[in-house]
Curated annotation (Swiss-Prot):
Mitochondrial matrix side: 17-33
Protein keywords: Acetylation, Membrane, Mitochondrion, Mitochondrion inner membrane, Transit peptide, Transmembrane, Transmembrane helix
Record's bilayer topology term: Single-pass membrane protein
Name of the protein in question: Cytochrome c oxidase subunit 7C, mitochondrial
GO biological process terms on file: mitochondrial electron transport, cytochrome c to oxygen
Pathway entry: Energy metabolism; oxidative phosphorylation
Originating species: Pongo pygmaeus
Gene Ontology CC terms: mitochondrial inner membrane; respiratory chain complex IV
Function description: Component of the cytochrome c oxidase, the last enzyme in the mitochondrial electron transport chain which drives oxidative phosphorylation. The respiratory chain contains 3 multisubunit complexes succinate dehydrogenase (complex II, CII), ubiquinol-cytochrome c oxidoreductase (cytochrome b-c1 complex, complex III, CIII) and cytochrome c oxidase (complex IV, CIV), that cooperate to transfer electrons derived from NADH and succinate to molecular oxygen, creating an electrochemical gradient over the inner membrane that drives transmembrane transport and the ATP synthase.
Membrane-spanning parts: 34-60
Family: Belongs to the cytochrome c oxidase VIIc family.
Length: 63
């Protein structure tokens, strides 16, 4: 009896918590505008690529 009520409760919770599905719907940013996505990706990957060079430049200018 208790097992059936627990099973009924968990399946109803899963059924009520429905999210949008499809490509790009599970990402924390919008992929609708390709130019905005391009700018965000360039900023993200560009900063990761440039950081070691900026650190080396800072260290060389320090001495």
């Amino acid at each position: 009896m208790l097992g059936q009520s627990i099973r009924r409760f968990t399946t109803s919770v899963v059924r009520r918590s429905h999210y949008e599905e499809g490509p790009g719907k599970n990402l924390p940013f919008s992929v609708e505008n390709k130019w905005s996505l391009l700018a965000k990706m360039c900023l993200y990957f560009g900063s990761a690529f440039a950081t070691p060079f900026l650190i080396v430049r800072h260290q060389l200018l320090k001495t």
